[in-house]
């Protein structure tokens, strides 16, 4: 089986789409012939270029109509030359371009589309793309329900939960974790509960709700907490609010990280508090795999990760007051954080692993193809 993965994101940071595609490509490259088409200079193109048994192709997915013809020609040439069995698209821009590039091809690939986010599906444009889509993958049950209510409901739909490498994302030795914590915070590391997130700093992540919650606490309780963030530089408005709340000294920003494990090892409690866009969150699952209980907002598929009070907590979206109440309990020692971390790790090993993620996705591919196309599979290599 020959598979082409496409992704339109052009930035250098590793986001959820990049993580998703790169893990599938690396995991399935011993079984199938894998190629990735992504913009030159993007994080995904760079990762693909370094992967063994994966071919990387520089491909733009422009939104401007004037740039579409050249991009369509480039992609059509690739599709015609390589004869892919499956093209797995991951967003509206690459989905649209694949649809256009496949027109009039004698041998058209089967198109699999993963719905990663919770952005509403436009009925008109989705109706057009659904006609050339053979299977839709939802990354959580919430998204599956949304997809089935959309024009894509006419397609075959499966839920395949995002998987993480639980051997790669695993708890650190306590001494190593303490060393990374000291390097991150210095003297502020001692006697404080470190709340951290590798989910990013975009506005829809609503991480400022946690800052607002700490600001609501009495000074002696607030002093028990420090917040650490990994991700892009704070926006001007975010920085302005930090300063207005007097919280600048209580927040540490480490920037964008290629490898988040040292950072995650240093924290006590993770959080993903999104109020838009988010679905299941790789970051949440990575933190849980590393033995960290996680606070999530009751939004989209985020609660599907958590057993409340066992391996994390679910709070109302955009609810600093509810967060502040939870922080009071954390400061008072009402939760056994190490035990909750062990429960998070155990759940990740049982439910979040790469194996089911890869096998379920491969099953979608096989079910989408006619029997004769399965001869492209490389037997015995996985």
Predicted regions and their residues:
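Conserved acidic donor-binding segment of nucleotide-sugar-dependent glycosyltransferases
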Residues: 308-309, 313-320, 329-335
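N-terminal strand-loop element at the rim of the active site
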Residues: 5-15, 20-23, 27-67, 156-157, ...
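Conserved donor-binding/catalytic core segment of Leloir-type glycosyltransferases
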Residues: 4-6, 188-205, 211-214
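Carbohydrate-associated surface elements
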Residues: 142, 163
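A conserved, positively charged/aromatic
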Residues: 106-141, 152
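Short hydrophobic beta-strand element within catalytic cores of glycosyltransferases
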Residues: 37, 293-296, 306
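Active-site donor-binding acidic/aromatic loop of nucleotide-activated sugar
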Residues: 236-237, 248-257, 263, 313-314
